[in-house]
Amino acid sequence: MPLVSISLRKGKSETYRQALIDGVYQAMRDTFSVPEDDQFITVTEHDPSNFRYGASYLDIARSDDVVFIQISAMASQTSDQKKALYARIVELLANNPGMRPEDVFVNVIEGVKENWSLGNGIAQYA
């Protein structure tokens, strides 16, 4: 049950933002075996003055189209699954909405099952 936050600079269309959501969700389904309808994703747009990135950190040439994707998930994925997720996200977002691979920044944060309550004030997975 991943919880996803996508951050980008203001100015992209609703269609573009929806393509980000759809691509990340499909990549998680393909690599993390996320079930259908397990969609908990937000998109936050930022004014340029509130959005900073390293334009060439680690010799990766990022543009103003860079997107930060942070995925909080239970600690159950292998290193290979995470690598596959990163590659699949880049592949899908390159296809639609046409992102450059250099502009896809992904961070996975893992936690234990008892750290999750999906509603009703209970820990469904603990």
Give the label of every model feature segment.
Residues 1-126:
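Interaction-mediating elements
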